[in-house]
């Protein structure tokens, strides 16, 4: 069980919620949420794919299978190569074999069901929506491979979806860089209302949001981030998850 949330986290989440409740602006407030490593922990997705791979190779390569079976959730890193190193898989041919198998499945509807919401995430997004905000999910997932699974997972976990005031923005092309997509997508939310808060795990996206919407409360989820990520802007807040108690 994780430790109780820090007072700073509780106060920040309540402050955003209170801003929505007391909103007096001409346009409706918009709160933006990323999905992977923000609302959802997608490391279980990687573990499931690895375990599936193990079942296919355990007879032919028991040594590789045993190494992969030693993987635990806390060993799953942002980069698969780092994850494989954590369980002792270094050989280039093995790394390539596992990586190809993983890549064919990770960005696919069928495996999104493995994702797990971070603590308090469904409840908090529901509260934001119930308080009167439009909610925008802006994700680096792509339309062709992940739209159906994403909608189903949001629904199954109790996030608001498929109702008025909910936006879901995905990349039109899986090969498009996430930051480039968000650089183009975030400004379009001006059509929906005024962006007052944004939650994302990537420092680059948080800094981008702060430059696009200076008055906005921008919050980084301290989960996983791309290696070599830029330093967070001074006025970006940091939390661990969405628990308020």
Residue positions per predicted region:
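Alpha-helical substrate-recognition element adjacent to the catalytic core
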Residues: 2, 36-156, 165-171
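Long, acidic (Asp/Glu-rich), low-complexity accessory segments flanking structured domains
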Residues: 1-17, 68
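Short, hydrophobic/glycine-enriched beta-strand segments
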Residues: 29-36
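Acidic, Mg2+-coordinating phosphoryl-transfer loop and its flanking beta/alpha structural elements
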Residues: 192-240
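Substrate-recognition "cap/lid" segment bordering the active-site pocket of phosphatases
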Residues: 141-196, 207-211
């Amino acid at each position: 069980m994780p430790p109780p949330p820090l007072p700073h986290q509780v106060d920040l989440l309540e402050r955003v919620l209170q801003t929505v409740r007391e909103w007096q602006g001409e346009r409706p407030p918009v709160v933006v949420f990323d999905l992977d490593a923000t609302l959802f922990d997608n490391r279980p997705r990687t573990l499931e794919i690895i375990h599936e791979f193990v079942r296919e190779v355990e007879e032919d390569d028991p040594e590789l299978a045993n190494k992969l079976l030693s993987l635990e959730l806390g060993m799953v890193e942002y980069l698969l190569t780092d994850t494989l190193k954590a369980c002792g898989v270094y050989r280039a041919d093995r790394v390539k074999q596992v990586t190809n198998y993983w890549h064919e499945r990770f960005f696919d509807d069928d495996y999104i069901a493995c994702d797990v919401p971070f603590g308090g995430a469904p409840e908090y997004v529901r509260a934001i929506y119930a308080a009167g905000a439009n909610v925008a999910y802006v994700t680096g997932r792509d339309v062709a491979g992940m739209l159906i699974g994403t909608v189903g997972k949001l629904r199954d976990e109790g996030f608001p979806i498929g109702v008025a005031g909910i936006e879901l923005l995905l990349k039109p092309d899986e090969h498009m860089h996430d930051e480039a997509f968000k650089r183009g997508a975030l400004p379009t939310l001006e059509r929906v209302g005024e962006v007052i808060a944004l939650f994302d795990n990537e420092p680059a996206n948080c800094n981008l949001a702060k430059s696009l919407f200076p008055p906005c409360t921008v919050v980084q989820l301290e989960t996983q981030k791309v290696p070599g990520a830029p330093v967070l802007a001074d006025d970006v807040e940091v939390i661990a998850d969405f628990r308020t108690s």
